[in-house]
Amino acid sequence: MTTYLFTSESVSEGHPDKIADQISDAVLDAILEQDPKARVACETYVKTGMVMVGGEITTSAWVDIEEITRQTVREIGYVNSEMGFDANSCAVLSAIGKQSPDINQGVDREDPLQQGAGDQGLMFGYATNETDVLMPAPITYAHRLVQRQAEVRKNGVLPWLRPDAKSQVTFQYNNDKIVGVDAVVLSTQHAENISQKDLQEAVMEEIIKPVLPAEWLNPTTKYFINPTGRFVIGGPMGDCGLTGRKIIVDTYGGMARHGGGAFSGKDPSKVDRSAAYAARYVAKNIVAAGLADRCEIQVSYAIGVAEPTSIMVETFGTEKVSTATLTLLVREFFDLRPHGLIQMLDLLHPIYRDTAAYGHFGRPQFPWEATDKAEALRDAAGLKLSAMNM
């Protein structure tokens, strides 16, 4: 029997890096709403009292970047200078240029199906049947903890909470099956007038217990709630934030490989984002079809070229049909050319701001989380639903 521990972390929407991600994606959404064919690469930097938005944007749309920035920060919850950051008074600087025409000539084509990739690169998608959303449990529950922190902060259950928070969950596995939670870490920014004792009790009762399944908690589970003893200074006052610095939080919590490209602020012509979404869609449908218990997809591209340079399927010995068969099925059922995957997942819509906190995967509102190809994959592989005990 192989026993091991695996840990993943998440951060809240008020974490400085996530503020930056959300601003970048809010700008992207505002542009796509007017101009679905826009080329957007929007980067954001936040620090005490200021936000800088930069990058390359080519579009026919006009958007009010300052107001988008302030509204995003306002919705996150930084509305008072006592928190160290205030949507109403922070400076907003803009440094936006246009996308290079050298890139444009490689991407744009008269025949949309021949649209080239916006850059070279490699992307991964992953799925596992260990949770109902076909995601690894450590990252799934790390996300749910900080989502719950935001919920009880915003609805007034714990009004002394502040927007910045981090979570970390360690699961124990035996033979790749979950047997319990070994450790939970939750650090949350708070008002100065709350005691450590009251904070720890409230976080346990209102955040941790409602989120983590009781059957996974046991007397040996360790809890670390604000282990430094104080977290008053947080958000951009505590640390600067940058778009694209939480790529493992955004994906699979380290349980799967990562190609290195960030997502937020990029329009779907950037395969760093769109192909990673498509790879998740492929992997999730393979697992949903019962063709494997775990599946990782790698896809790669050359700039200006439509066809992927490679497609790889890894199932970690859990496959019910050969990986060669799975690779053929992927090529048959999924169009992974840039234009094809944009159409397949209907990506030219303003859906991206909501992806920028609490994970891009495992949340059913996003089109790449659909399992609408599972039945066709199963039938093509010659497997019946009953045979898979599904």
Curated annotation (Swiss-Prot):
<protein>
    <recommendedName>
        <fullName>S-adenosylmethionine synthase</fullName>
        <ecNumber>2.5.1.6</ecNumber>
    </recommendedName>
</protein>
<feature type="binding site" description="in other chain">
    <location>
        <begin position="230"/>
        <end position="231"/>
    </location>
    <ligand>
        <name>ATP</name>
    </ligand>
</feature>
<dbReference type="Pfam" id="PF00438">
    <property type="entry name" value="S-AdoMet_synt_N"/>
</dbReference>
<keyword id="KW-0630">Potassium</keyword>
<feature type="binding site">
    <location>
        <position position="43"/>
    </location>
    <ligand>
        <name>K(+)</name>
    </ligand>
</feature>
<keyword id="KW-0963">Cytoplasm</keyword>
<feature type="binding site" description="in other chain">
    <location>
        <position position="56"/>
    </location>
    <ligand>
        <name>L-methionine</name>
    </ligand>
</feature>
<feature type="binding site" description="in other chain">
    <location>
        <begin position="245"/>
        <end position="246"/>
    </location>
    <ligand>
        <name>ATP</name>
    </ligand>
</feature>
<comment type="pathway">
    <text>Amino-acid biosynthesis; S-adenosyl-L-methionine biosynthesis; S-adenosyl-L-methionine from L-methionine: step 1/1.</text>
</comment>
<feature type="binding site" description="in other chain">
    <location>
        <position position="99"/>
    </location>
    <ligand>
        <name>L-methionine</name>
    </ligand>
</feature>
<keyword id="KW-0554">One-carbon metabolism</keyword>
<dbReference type="Pfam" id="PF02773">
    <property type="entry name" value="S-AdoMet_synt_C"/>
</dbReference>
<dbReference type="InterPro" id="IPR022636">
    <property type="entry name" value="S-AdoMet_synthetase_sfam"/>
</dbReference>
<feature type="region of interest" description="Flexible loop">
    <location>
        <begin position="99"/>
        <end position="109"/>
    </location>
</feature>
<dbReference type="GO" id="GO:0005737">
    <property type="term" value="C:cytoplasm"/>
</dbReference>
<comment type="function">
    <text>Catalyzes the formation of S-adenosylmethionine (AdoMet) from methionine and ATP. The overall synthetic reaction is composed of two sequential steps, AdoMet formation and the subsequent tripolyphosphate hydrolysis which occurs prior to release of AdoMet from the enzyme.</text>
</comment>
<comment type="similarity">
    <text>Belongs to the AdoMet synthase family.</text>
</comment>
<feature type="binding site">
    <location>
        <position position="239"/>
    </location>
    <ligand>
        <name>L-methionine</name>
    </ligand>
</feature>
<feature type="binding site">
    <location>
        <position position="266"/>
    </location>
    <ligand>
        <name>ATP</name>
    </ligand>
</feature>
<keyword id="KW-0067">ATP-binding</keyword>
<dbReference type="InterPro" id="IPR002133">
    <property type="entry name" value="S-AdoMet_synthetase"/>
</dbReference>
<keyword id="KW-0808">Transferase</keyword>
<dbReference type="GO" id="GO:0006730">
    <property type="term" value="P:one-carbon metabolic process"/>
</dbReference>
<keyword id="KW-0479">Metal-binding</keyword>
<dbReference type="InterPro" id="IPR022629">
    <property type="entry name" value="S-AdoMet_synt_central"/>
</dbReference>
<keyword id="KW-0547">Nucleotide-binding</keyword>
<dbReference type="InterPro" id="IPR022628">
    <property type="entry name" value="S-AdoMet_synt_N"/>
</dbReference>
<dbReference type="Pfam" id="PF02772">
    <property type="entry name" value="S-AdoMet_synt_M"/>
</dbReference>
<feature type="binding site">
    <location>
        <position position="239"/>
    </location>
    <ligand>
        <name>ATP</name>
    </ligand>
</feature>
<feature type="binding site" description="in other chain">
    <location>
        <begin position="164"/>
        <end position="166"/>
    </location>
    <ligand>
        <name>ATP</name>
    </ligand>
</feature>
<dbReference type="GO" id="GO:0004478">
    <property type="term" value="F:methionine adenosyltransferase activity"/>
</dbReference>
<feature type="binding site">
    <location>
        <position position="17"/>
    </location>
    <ligand>
        <name>Mg(2+)</name>
    </ligand>
</feature>
<dbReference type="GO" id="GO:0005524">
    <property type="term" value="F:ATP binding"/>
</dbReference>
<feature type="binding site" description="in other chain">
    <location>
        <position position="270"/>
    </location>
    <ligand>
        <name>L-methionine</name>
    </ligand>
</feature>
<dbReference type="InterPro" id="IPR022631">
    <property type="entry name" value="ADOMET_SYNTHASE_CS"/>
</dbReference>
<dbReference type="GO" id="GO:0006556">
    <property type="term" value="P:S-adenosylmethionine biosynthetic process"/>
</dbReference>
<keyword id="KW-0460">Magnesium</keyword>
<dbReference type="InterPro" id="IPR022630">
    <property type="entry name" value="S-AdoMet_synt_C"/>
</dbReference>
<feature type="binding site" description="in other chain">
    <location>
        <position position="15"/>
    </location>
    <ligand>
        <name>ATP</name>
    </ligand>
</feature>
<dbReference type="GO" id="GO:0000287">
    <property type="term" value="F:magnesium ion binding"/>
</dbReference>
<comment type="subunit">
    <text>Homotetramer; dimer of dimers.</text>
</comment>
<feature type="binding site">
    <location>
        <position position="262"/>
    </location>
    <ligand>
        <name>ATP</name>
    </ligand>
</feature>
